[in-house]
Every structure is written in structure tokens, then in C-alpha cells.
Amino acid sequence: MLRPRRSLGVSSPAKQRKKAAPKNSMATRANRKRLPSYLKPGSAVEISSDEIGFRGSWYMGKVITIPSSSDKDSVKCQVEYTTLFFDKEGTKPLKEVVDMSQLRPPAPPMSEIEKKKKIVVGEEVDAFYNDGWWEGDVTEVLDDGKFSVFFRSSKEQIRFRKDELRFHREWVDGAWKPPLEETEEEEDESEEDKLDDSEDEEDILARVDLETTRAIAKQMFSSGTVVEVSSDEEGFQGCWFAAKVVEPVGEDKFLVEYRDLREKDGIEPLKEETDFLHIRPPPPRDEDIDFAVGDKINAFYNDGWWVGVVIDGMKHGTVGIYFRQSQEKMRFGRQGLRLHKDWVDGTWQLPLKGGKIKREKTVSCNRNVRPKKATEKQAFSIGTPIEVSPEEEGFEDSWFLAKLIEYRGKDKCLVEYDNLKAEDGKEPLREEVNVSRIRPLPLESVMVSPFERHDKVNALYNDGWWVGVIRKVLAKSSYLVLFKNTQELLKFHHSQLRLHQEWIDGKWITSFKSQKV
């Protein structure tokens, strides 16, 4: 359950008969010599915990001490909690030494637009409970203005008022994702202001973390990867051309071969070197978007994608576009247009004005969700194929295929895993688990569209399905998936992923992106 946090206990290590969760093998931002700007003595921060039962929660506090500049290997900070105390009287604030990766700046307060925004079923939120903010998913909007929130870590469902909730955000690469929605005053600009408010290449580069961008490019772009390449050549600034990587060159350059550009002989594809700041993956498709006046778009013209602005809506199948760089006005069909997106620190960012996509999350489920109760025995027959979520440390948010062998007492059962072996390495592993840790096999589904950033998925890894979030969309139907408990980022093919579903009160809550079979 989501219990009050009093003091930190040391839990016993997990048994090693299962393969552990993905462990963080990549250097974190905390390993850099330069400390994040928000880590200063006295600075307010939010603090997370690695302790079992508290993962997914954030507590307010302040920084007491930071790593010494003379100790290059130190990544530890001392913090003091605002709402947690050593004593029952609440007079001695709890102090603790934590890793820098467990700290982030305080989440931004909701904007006026977000305060008026409806919280819908399926929305990811943080709920203030037992002195901290806990990550959960809205499963029901109640008539009394309250919301039922399901917490995956504890398998609990609790009701909250709207003022006890905030929209969930992640602190990634020094920025909040998704970013804070703009205020009404900022959105109420005239169409003329929108047309004049363009970002040039220098504005985009100002938002780029060079080290992060270099590392991402080195990881993503190998030989054969489909990419887009831009140029600083006069007359071509801001235009992106389709290409593929021939081979990496040195630490931060790539030899690319263009798809539509030719050498002087007009036959062989043009090849040239480009650096990590001028290469990116192809942006995700947006066929279903209706363009509006003021939208910043890319138009395919003369073998490349050029930046323009919509000045006239759809008429007779075409849209009017204005190109600032050449001062030209032209009309294009829908197939030759796409919303403009910037590739910044490994994420796709939409323009702040015009062309803004708001993707409301919905789910297909019975909204009359009952208060949480233990899984009933009668739900599963002996021999039924099931999935089991182990209670051991290191296996949170993972599910393993098994079958039900027998029930033991009121709330226990014996299961036999399909892919996990006993200590002899031959016989299938059998284990006694709580009935609350088992569920039926998820609904088979057909994906209506490819996965997108922030989609919650299950990734097949080390014989089990692990809950993660799509962090980056790669070429060749591949994705980078972030596992929040370990902060590990791993690459998976589409065939190794399934859309995340929750088993709540005997029903599957599933995303609108799939169709049940």
C-alpha cells in the first residue's frame, strides 16, 4: 500500500534465481563534473527514493550539502525533507544522503490553462498522499468532482479531489517533459503575431545541449540508418533532405548518401559529410492533422522539406503556404505537407504556437470502477495461463508467463513459470505468491498506429514483460524505452513491445491506440 514514510530501512537483497531488471549501464548526467544549476545548498528540490514501497513518489525538501569539487567521483548530496521527520512530534526534519540522480527541481505549478483543463480517464497524474507526490493513472471521473487513481506500484485505487492532483511530468535532460502548457495570454496572440514569431536555426541551437545531442547521434545513427540532413549552405538553411548513413566518421560526423540529390553526373546519389547538429531521424507522421492558419509546417519542394507557414486554409484540396526565406507564396496538396517539428536533445518538439497537438488520453473500460479489493480465487481455474508479478526487489513492474497450480489458504497460490527455471536449471520454477500478484493474459491487440513518445509499453526482456515508456522513436520500427525504476534506456524492435494494459477489478484498462482482437 502507499504507506507513510517515516525512516529508511535496508531491505534484504533479492534472490538471484530470476534475471534481474535492466540495470543502468549508461553514464548518468550526474556523472558530469559540472553540477546541475538547481543543486546548490539551500535550493528547494523534490526527492525520490529507491526504497521498496516508495518508488514512484517524490517528496519536497532542500539541499544541505553538494559533492565536493575536489572529489570527482562523488555523486552524493545531503538533503533535508520538508514533510518527513525523525520524531513523531514533527520537530526534527528527516535528513538523508542521496544520489544526485534522485533529485530534481520542484515541479512547476499548473498554468491557468492546466487548472481549467479537464482531467480525463487514462490521464497520468501525481497525487498528493501521505506527505508526498505519487505517480498514478486516473481510472474514473466521479460525480462528486473526485477522481479514482490507480497506483501500479501498490496495486491500489484511491479517490482524490482535483486540488490533490497535478499532471505528471518527467525531468529529462534538464527540462520538464511534457513542457508546461502556455498561459491564455500567450495563446491569445493575433495571426499576424504568429506569422512573425518564427524560430531560426540559432534559436533552436540555443535550446540544444551539445553533449547530449552528440551522444544521442552516436548511439542512434549507424550504417544504413534512414535520416534527414540539413545544410548551412546559403539558400538551403532550414531545409531537410532524406538520406541514409553510409558510415560514422570520427566522434561526431557521418558520411551520408542522399535519397533524392545526385552527383554532378546526375546518376550517382550525392554523398557528403555532415556533423551531429545537422542530422536527425525522420519525424513521426501526422496524416490525421488538419492544418490551420498560422501553423508552422514543412512543405516538400525541390527534393527537400522547407519551412513555411499556413496562410490560407484548405481550398479545393490545397493549402496556401508562405515561405519567409524566399518571400514566396505557394499552394500544396495535403500529401506534400507535414507539421514542423524540431529535434532537440533526442526529442521531437512542436512549435509553441500554431500546429500544437493536444493528444487526449482515453481508455476503453467500464467507468463504474468499484473500490479496490483482493482478487477472487474463482477468477482463475487450476491450470489457467496467467502472468505473475514477483514481489522481490528488482522485479517491480515486471510480469512473467506462468500457469496456476493450486490455491493455498485464502490469499496464496502456487504457480509454475513458463520460462524461469529452478536452481537445477532443468525443472520449471514453482513459487508461492499472493493472489493479488497474478492476472490473466492481457488482451491481444492490433496496433492502429506506431508507438509514439510517452506511450506506456511492456518490453520483452530477460524472459518477462517490463513496464516502460517510449523515450525515442528510431528508424526501422525500433524504439528507445525508458525503465523508470532503473532509469535504464534500452533499444527494442516493435515486435518486442506491446501496449501497456492494467488489470483493475476484473477488467482490462487498455489504450485507445490499439484494437482488441
From Swiss-Prot:
Residues 181-202 have a biased composition (Acidic residues). Disruption phenotype: Abnormal transcription up-regulation of some transposable elements (TEs) and of hypermethylated loci (including MU1, GP1, SN1 and ERT7). Hypomethylated DNA CHG and CHH regions. Reduced H3K9me2 levels. Increased ratio of decondensed nuclei. One of its GO terms (molecular function) is histone reader activity. Residues 1-35, 177-202 are annotated as: Disordered. Its main location: nucleus. GO terms for cellular component: chromosome, centromeric region; heterochromatin; nucleus. One of its GO terms (biological process) is DNA methylation-dependent constitutive heterochromatin formation. It is found in: Nucleus. Heterochromatin-binding protein that preferentially occupies long transposons and specifically recognizes the histone H3 'Lys-9' methylation (H3K9me) marks, with a stronger affinity for dimethylated H3K9 (H3K9me2). Required for transcriptional silencing, non-CG DNA methylation (e.g. CHG and CHH regions), and H3K9 dimethylation (H3K9me2) at some loci. Mediates heterochromatin phase separation and chromocenter formation. The tandem Agenet domains (AGDs) mediate the specific recognition of the histone 3 lysine 9 dimethylation (H3K9me2) mark. This is Protein AGENET DOMAIN (AGD)-CONTAINING P1.
